[in-house]
Amino acid sequence: MGSLTLVLVAVDAPMARAWRTLTEGRTGLVVHEGSITDVDTDAVVSPANSFGLMGGGIDAVYARWFPGISDRVRAGSGGELPVGEAVIVPTGVERPAWLVSAPTMRSPGERLPPDGAAARAAARAVLRLWRDGTLPDGVRVRDAVHTIALPGLGTGVGGLAPDVCAGQVGAAWDEVLGEA
């Protein structure tokens, strides 16, 4: 299996601290402080809603960066992608070539429960897609995607605390790739 570098993106100090704690004792995780648009990566993660509507938070950034991406996400998911599942679609630009949609909420604007279960489900879906999924041309995702930039999952619109998000992403990493 190929190796994955997961770039944990923090736009503020609390998220950066939480991500740094997560990287302790784990290889393959690096922290980037700043905009996700500055990360040189193969794929970015959209912690969108199940309907692929991309009008708020990081998804609004993606909608401006990758024209038509919301339509591609909806087409790739059949119109609704449940929390805990992920789909990978082309961005239409050279880098990052791919966007992974992994919803943290069903409907736009939902506040997430404080336990962070949705962040864990989304992170697990991203990592399983990388480990087991295929691109539209049949190439295994893990053979084509070596870096994925991950923003806080549910920490913006969803209102999840950064430390809870980081803990849940770490649990998903250990569960899915801990033996990789």
Language model segments and positions:
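Macrodomain-like recognition of ADP-ribose-binding/processing modules
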Residues: 1-180
